[in-house]
UniProtKB/Swiss-Prot annotation:
This is Glucan endo-1,3-beta-glucosidase, basic vacuolar isoform GLB. It catalyses: Hydrolysis of (1->3)-beta-D-glucosidic linkages in (1->3)-beta-D-glucans. It comes from Nicotiana tabacum (Common tobacco). It holds the Pfam family Glyco_hydro_17. Residues 1-32 form the signal peptide. One of its GO terms (cellular component) is vacuole. Keywords: Glycoprotein, Glycosidase, Hydrolase, Plant defense, Pyrrolidone carboxylic acid, Signal, Vacuole. Implicated in the defense of plants against pathogens. Induction: By ethylene and salicylic acid. Glycans are attached at residue 361.
Amino acid sequence: MSTSDKHNTPQMAAITLLGLLLVASTIEIAGAQSIGVCYGMLGNNLPNHWEVIQLYKSRNIGRLRLYDPNHGALQALKGSNIEVMLGLPNSDVKHIASGMEHARWWVQKNVKDFWPDVKIKYIAVGNEISPVTGTSYLTSFLTPAMVNIYKAIGEAGLGNNIKVSTSVDMTLIGNSYPPSQGSFRNDARWFTDPIVGFLRDTRAPLLVNIYPYFSYSGNPGQISLPYSLFTAPNVVVQDGSRQYRNLFDAMLDSVYAALERSGGASVGIVVSESGWPSAGAFGATYDNAATYLRNLIQHAKEGSPRKPGPIETYIFAMFDENNKNPELEKHFGLFSPNKQPKYNLNFGVSGGVWDSSVETNATASLISEM
């Protein structure tokens, strides 16, 4: 080895180490980017919008769901590079369905006025509208509202940037066991089939709220806690060649099967809500919530037996919201209203915060020895 090679050895080691650290960080962060967090605002003690968006950024949370086009939040999101699922609330669905002029106005005021400074990725038209719940009065308006918003987005020149969909829950699934036999309820097919057709034709994903907690708490005699928390040591459900060790995958794949049976085999799924309450009802404990959330973040990188690969997933919710009811709805937050984390979660960063000082100090130490 030449003299110059000897002198360059520490420097090369530092550069090599820095490169490895950056690659490791990039891999971890890339995996974590499957995860977003829902920003609910039903609390009287929550931080202001600017503080909230700074919290998202500091915790490396790269995706956010808004339930309505709150202009304060949208202003705070400008330049943040956070991808946004923007909600068109149920209260606006009938109005938007009634005419294109209303859809154009909504898109102009809530989308185009903020684009491209705010990275809006989806418009979620309505949340959990269903013919079998208290929102049944809106069912006939949902697909027309989606169509009008889609057309308005296209007219605004954003059709290649923003997908239009709706967020549904599991009440629309008639059969979910085994997952391969998943299907939409027969008495709801008149409602779901047009939605599936719209999503297929526009190449947009279905947004699905998936909560193993509610399945477990409603039927603890047949659904085990480990199966619900991603901690089952063995296969719980054998479905042909597919093996299920957690309820989240089983629920997700039952929706994929339902889509396929409805002519939507090409339609993807984004998990628009999932979480676990830390108090307020049976099974709602701090330990259970921490376990579920930690495992969900990890599992979102991997995919389900039917659809391997990262699952775009939004955790519900950013904060505990004290104006929600019933009691357990107040306890889904990742953070307390004072911005203190309730759990030690990793969004691709150390302890929930990407602490680059570890890499910087390690590199500086090597360079100082040159």
